[in-house]
Amino acid sequence: MEAWECLEDFSAVRNLLEQSSNSTSWFWRFLWGSSQAKLVCRIKEDYKWEFEELLKSCGELFDSLNLGHQALFQEKVIKTLDFSTPGRAAAAVAFLSFIKDKWSEETHLSGGYLLDFLAMHLWRAVVRHKNRLLLLSSVRPAIIPTEEQQQQQEEARRRRQEQSPWNPRAGLDPRE
């Protein structure tokens, strides 16, 4: 996912969504847009019909968003985004860019609010995915040593203490 490490920075996510939305002209995107924004636009155009079908399955998503309710958006959209591969991450960004374009046609809310709202949720989903991966990679199964292994470890510890030139009990009362 090295190609999409920019998704870990909120301002980069916001810029990517802004550059890949229909509010940015293709000419500006062609001259100054990032390669990722161009890729997201291409994915958005290629999968337009699939994205339309996904939005139809979400029911009254835009009505609830216009009223300020986020629960449906969280359940139906954000929790289903997949960032396991660079291609899936690009598709997730393209889907949110598609949602921004459709939502801006049907709302009274400002474009800046839409952009901030979607960028914040996308960024949080990426960070949550990364933290989940880090947590899973750090969890190791507990290895319970057998009695024989415990005895071997204890003997090895005693030998190291005896061979050590530094004696932590030096100057103390002798052992009984």
Swiss-Prot record:
Listed GO biological process terms: symbiont-mediated suppression of host apoptosis
InterPro entries assigned: Adenovir_t-Ag_E1B_19kDa (IPR002924), Bcl2-like (IPR002475)
Keywords: Apoptosis, Early protein, Host cell membrane, Host membrane, Host nucleus, Host-virus interaction, Inhibition of host apoptosis by viral BCL2-like protein, Membrane, Modulation of host cell apoptosis by virus
Source organism, top-level taxon: Viruses
Annotated localization: Host cell membrane; Host nucleus envelope; Host nucleus lamina
GO CC annotations, alphabetized: host cell nuclear lamina; host cell plasma membrane; membrane
Region (Disordered): 146-176
Known function: Putative adenovirus Bcl-2 homolog that inhibits apoptosis induced by TNF or FAS pathways, as well as p53-mediated apoptosis. Without E1B 19K function, virus production is compromised because of premature death of host cell. Interacts with Bax protein in cell lysates.
Family of this protein: Belongs to the adenoviridae E1B 19 kDa protein family.
The protein's name: E1B protein, small T-antigen
Organism: Human adenovirus C serotype 5 (HAdV-5)
Lineage start: Viruses, Varidnaviria, Bamfordvirae, Preplasmiviricota, Tectiliviricetes
